[in-house]
Amino acid sequence: MEQQVEQQRLTAKDFHPEILKLFDRYVHGMIDRRGFLDGAAKFAVGGMTAAAILQALSPNYAWAEQVPESDKRIATMMLDYDSPKGQGKMKGYFAKPANLNGKIPGVVVIHENRGLTPYIKDVARRLAVANFVAFAPDALTPLGGYPGNDDKGVEMQRTLDQNKIIEDFIEAVNVLQKRPECTGKVGAVGFCFGGSVTNQLAVRVPSLAAAAPYYGGQPKAEDVAKINAPLMIHYGGLDERVNAGWPAYEAALKANGKKYEEYVYAGANHGFHNDTTPRYDKAAAELSWQRTIDFFNKNLRTGGRATN
């Protein structure tokens, strides 16, 4: 049965809503594996065991390649960089259009709570196809990088100093701004944990020219006044955990006169952009991504802040 689950691409509609909530709590460390299995067993249907449900909800990175590494439109490489206020020696995945002449804007891509997965690398390649230079650091660099297994990646990232991780991504903005391929105008996009970090970059990096957090934790209300970058904020309509922080964030944005757009995708779960799991919502992912590309084109190619 588990082999069949692995081969068949399921969607969120194939699972009881309570199972999806349990899975969200599991991947964010609120319950352990045993807690998920015990909870999911109450909703197991169609001959699927709780273990099979967990397997079915876990990423299948064979589905992540919208832009293959071999795509002749792009060029990629791993970059080393120093993060003196963060974790020290770091690595990141760099993607740009092939045969690039001149300079173009950049986007820092910030991963979820498990390191630099194949999905996040593919997001960087999608940005390169859209004519940006993209840089996706791996917060797990000090531990050897993303281990090839999401559960292990989550465990590894949980052991790291979260403040230092944020410093690593702040430094990544500086690195990308100074790249010879980049105009110096840089935005950020992040997912889940990366959405939270994207919000923090908006607070802490005055030169950030645009920020697009996906279903990320919100900054403290008292920090919102520090935001300079325009924001495009994406939420899944069913993501009760993250969405609970939005009213206070929105009130602070309005009170401080900040420029923002916020979109809630009805019927979409947390993680709806990640096309490697059943929580993926194709319509919401494609619409939100087109909006994000349009947002970056508007704010990074005209006006805004440049450092070079």
Language-model features: where?
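Short beta-strand element of the alpha/beta-hydrolase
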Residues: 103-112
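Primarily recognizes the serine-hydrolase "nucleophile elbow" in alpha/beta-hydrolase
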Residues: 171-228
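Gly/Ser-rich "nucleophile elbow"/oxyanion-hole loop immediately N-terminal to the catalytic nucleophile
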Residues: 150-189, 301-304
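N-terminal cap/lid segment of alpha/beta-hydrolase-fold proteins
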Residues: 65-100
